[in-house]
Amino acid sequence: MKDLLKFLKAQTKTEEFDAIKIALASPDMIRSWSFGEVKKPETINYRTFKPERDGLFCARIFGPVKDYECLCGKYKRLKHRGVICEKCGVEVTQTKVRRERMGHIELASPTAHIWFLKSLPSRIGLLLDMPLRDIERVLYFESYVVIEGGMTNLERRQILTEEQYLDALEEFGDEFDAKMGAEAIQALLKNMDLEAECEILREELNETNSETKRKKLTKRIKLLEAFVQSGNKPEWMILTVLPVLPPDLRPLVPLDGGRFATSDLNDLYRRVINRNNRLKRLLDLAAPDIIVRNEKRMLQEAVDALLDNGRRGRAITGSNKRPLKSLADMIKGKQGRFRQNLLGKRVDYSGRSVITVGPYLRLHQCGLPKKMALELFKPFIYGKLELRGLATTIKAAKKMVEREEAVVWDILDEVIREHPVLLNRAPTLHRLGIQAFEPVLIEGKAIQLHPLVCAAYNADFDGDQMAVHVPLTLEAQLEARALMMSTNNILSPANGEPIIVPSQDVVLGLYYMTRDCVNAKGEGMVLTGPKEAERIYRAGLASLHARVKVRITEEIRNTEGESTSRTSIIDTTVGRAILWMIVPKGLPYSIVNQPLGKKAISKMLNTCYRILGLKPTVIFADQIMYTGFAYAARSGASVGIDDMVIPEAKAGIIEEAETEVAEIQEQFQSGLVTAGERYNKVIDIWAAANERVAKAMMDNLSVEDVVNRDGVVEQQVSFNSIFMMADSGARGSAAQIRQLAGMRGLMAKPDGSIIETPITANFREGLNVLQYFISTHGARKGLADTALKTANSGYLTRRLVDVAQDLVVTEDDCGTHNGIVMTPVIEGGDVKEPLRDRVLGRVTAEEVIKPGTADILVPRNTLLDEKWCDLLEENSVDSVKVRSVVSCETDFGVCANCYGRDLARGHIINKGEAVGVIAAQSIGEPGTQLTMRTFHIGGAASRAAAESSIQVKNKGSLKLSNVKFVTNAAGKLVITSRNTELKLIDEFGRTKESYKVPYGAVMAKGDGAEVQGGETVANWDPHIMPVVTEVSGFIRFADMIDGQTITRQTDELTGLSSLVVLDSAERTGSGKDLRPALKIVDAKGDDVLIPGTDMPAQYFLPGKAIVQLEDGIQIGAGDTLARIPQESSGTKDITGGLPRVADLFEARRPKEPAILAEISGIISFGKETKGKRRLVISPLDGSDAYEEMIPKWRQLNVFEGEIVERGDVVSDGPESPHDILRLRGVHAVTRYITNEVQEVYRLQGVKINDKHIEVIVRQMLRKGTIVDAGSTDFLEGEQAEMSRVKIANRKLAAEGKIEATFTRDLLGITKASLATESFISAASFQETTRVLTEAAVAGKRDELRGLKENVIVGRLIPAGTGYAYHQDRMRRKAQGEAPVVPQVSADEATANLAELLNAGFGNSKD
């Protein structure tokens, strides 16, 4: 028995490993793996079902078919273990060796491995520096290649056709060596001296200047170096020995009726063996060359098909006309090994069923049908039955359970007690899609779910199904209880707000309960407390809504957390007093003394969690739910057709609109407006009418007239059921009520354009056939959109998870002083997101100074919680520099301080938290709520009229930034700078509003001026761009020659004449080189200088500019010299919704991006070409100027002589994130991507914390391009992981050597995922073949740092609870201790023994 245990122990040993390396296999290595050569294509004998000897399933090579039994049956049983039978040559051992023993095929002629040949860029081609076409022609026996030129004039690697070869033979005889086929390529590869080649290339690299050549050389150098360093030999890319997969991994299963089901691989192998054997025979017979050649070509094709079918030529098909599944197909794609079996496994101990409501459950419970529980917990029940002595054997226990004896149910109750189960609803879009509950046994067959967790699961009860999983081990149960229990997941990880929020009925119930009503029964009573309130309500003495005075005792907690109680008599209603009874101690009464809608309830729960913590909140949430359901039932709110009150004003409003439309139609027919203008105006009219009807309807619905106690009629908020449902946030919205009782309004055609006749009817009146038909467009598009959206959103999430999966919090503090400056998000006159929301839960990067003093308000490295944020608000701080993931200095992972608060828990984040995955889920999960559509700015959808002035909303003082201006004769300011910003500051120094002021705008008040709310502070003409003079003097025309560079135009209506500058295309020959300009001179005729510079004031005029001045006229500073008409930008489509988010994260360059200034300096224009202008920027310090050619049709925002800063916009358009990174740096690009992504989510009302987007941006910025390698071994122009560059630089700095310099690169998420250090992670994401080919050639090591790699190799992940295990392993490795070998316990040994003994009876195939 002892040696048996020893033997078992040897089999359960797990291999401990630190990394996985992939490399090319040498022929000797393949032979060393092999247990014998497969010589015959036969598989199994169809009569005896025994494998054929030397065939693809041969027992002698691969091992016995039955456990511990040789093929001929001479040796059976365990005692002959390890004997090799003399008759059939089979080793007596377990049959599972047939899963691991490999064979091999000795190929009669070498064949190229198709991956290294055809996977682009072709590795063989790159190594030999030959085009792929040529190599293919050699491999498939169409031409010869010269291997050794000898004394002849033939070059090595030269391609010869058949004729050329024969000519050369005649001419030179055997002076030279030329071959065809894989042997030739193999010989070429063998003869390469990699190191020498490398040296030559490096010298070439230093000498060349051409960019393309450099690129090609660096590619080759990298490949050669990879070969040298990894120890791979180039000739191994040509196979001489082909490994054969173990037979149990390519099974052949007999079906009934004498047919066989087989893996496609067997067919592919059979082909290879057949052709190989035929080739061997032909070579033995010394057959004619042409036949042998053909056979070799066919062998090459057969091997290609086995490795990667369909990569070259047509795929080989099986009997059913489908392409056969080759080895490459086995591992790639959704159905491949990686995604189907390694990353997504099916789980035992699980069941699924329909869900239904469990309104009486507690938050941590779920109802589990008895039938299901019995099945799921079977093994536990068997164990308990045996332990109690109620059953003697497992078999007896099994019988008892099958008979469902009474005692079984009692045992089940015990087993289930406090054993959590996991509930999962597909699709699991974020981590709250799986939560743990304690099961409560119920009758019936449906799982009961607590209503408050529906929001997290996105579940409803219209037939949704959920799956139940049982955590088996103690550790799993512990994790389920401590981390996954629904009571521990009250806050959403995406934004830190409660996700356990009542909805629908509960909200309606609470709203109904806390509403007040004029002159209700019992109004004016004074009550001793909530208890009495409930008593008089139950007794029917007072209505729930009666306004009464109640004595209320509140417990107030001060900052130290001590509580003091205070009692006061408060004006409230009976319902609110009753509700107060369930509110936990420590919250103020004001929190319930208001009509509670959904937002208010959410805020109440949030406050409760922040003040009192987890447990009271959970109890409170449950109580809220029970109360809400009870009072919703009491309210009896129901919807009848009469509740949809149609406003009387509707008919009048529609009539007015129709008259206006008719009027515009007349104008159109008389030619006053164009068709486009007419269409737009009509749509605007109807949109306005719709708004008016809706307003009339809501005004009508939301109030009702009642008689109060004094008999006077007064208005109160309505108790109309539909209004209450919308107002409380329980169901429906104003927009939906508008369709019920207002008018349906404008509809869109399937292409997105708006139909100009609206649906004037509503659902209460009913639609006529035409109206119904129009509305079906929208409905159908909605359904089609939803289907597309779900798929796209899922794919976005997958890409995000893949790029961020290896980001884990690995240390407490990286010590950096960098960070990003946070300011409130202000658009125009309203604060979209206050500073408080943006910095809450962040850590300060430097001290926050109290505004106006030198006092430190908040020290450095402080986690800003609610209290600190209150302090910031009190002192009206409007910008804070906080730590950010993007600027974190940790090498692999991020530090806790740079991340800040764990949003789902409310304290600083723990080490080992997988922040990358959380970020990806938080961004991906709301993806399905985003729209798919691209908005047409047209129709009523969203058309902003061209802005022409700034009107402030609040009073305060103005603050102008990056401003240059001149004061004109009227004493007003004329802006002469490009990106001027105007901010409105209130008396506390906070920014309230922010606007962009264009060039040439006229401002009545300057910097620091006080303004009142509603005042207009700036005006400009949106349709022209002025040229403003900065000095006073007299005008002098330069190069303004009539007929050559300008023409005169006279306006027919006013009779005024003006000069128009001709575009260079319209000028005659002599005028082409002239540059029309206006100079400003003084009375003597000398040039006036621009203030602060030594440049003469002259303004060059671009084409189409209009001048309304004459030569010699006197002008004052700030006057307009010329006007340049702006073509109104056509209706551009703004991409919205999901596609926009995907574009941002993929870092795609927009079609016509904004052109930014590459360096700071003075603008001038050089010589123009036919379609382009030459923009020259000369730096102020006199260094080299920068030139760029810009197409003529791009409108430029700059004039000659203007000073620009690096990164300023030269020509408008959407900015490319790559340009922003290059010119303005990492923080600017972070800000840009964050703001743009948030814009999309904000439109849909989804809140996501900026942190998550920053996490993804950090991953997009992982790589950099080396500019100068210094003393490192990087190549210049190489893309390298930033962490590796930083580590290398630190090492060099310590040694005092030259560090490498680099620029940061921004990669899209797909590219970034494929460019990760880990080849396992990249291969399991996309383009498996390419990734593995690259990794094998380079001999890459995967250090298994990320989560995905560890899941694939079947280890604990280095995050969460697995973090400690990995830290422990690292520590042991550092100290050089031996890894702990898991000891086999007695139970495991007996289980294994039972398995061995049973193996003889039933041979189970998996």
Swiss-Prot record:
GO BP annotations listed: DNA-templated transcription
Sequence positions that bind Zn(2+) 1: 70, 72, 85, 88
Stored Pfam families: RNA_pol_Rpb1_1, RNA_pol_Rpb1_2, RNA_pol_Rpb1_3, RNA_pol_Rpb1_4, RNA_pol_Rpb1_5
Cofactor needs: Mg(2+); Zn(2+)
Catalytic activity: RNA(n) + a ribonucleoside 5'-triphosphate = RNA(n+1) + diphosphate
HAMAP family to which the protein is assigned, alphabetical: RNApol_bact_RpoC
UniProt name for this protein: DNA-directed RNA polymerase subunit beta'
Organism, scientific name: Yersinia enterocolitica serotype O:8 / biotype 1B (strain NCTC 13174 / 8081)
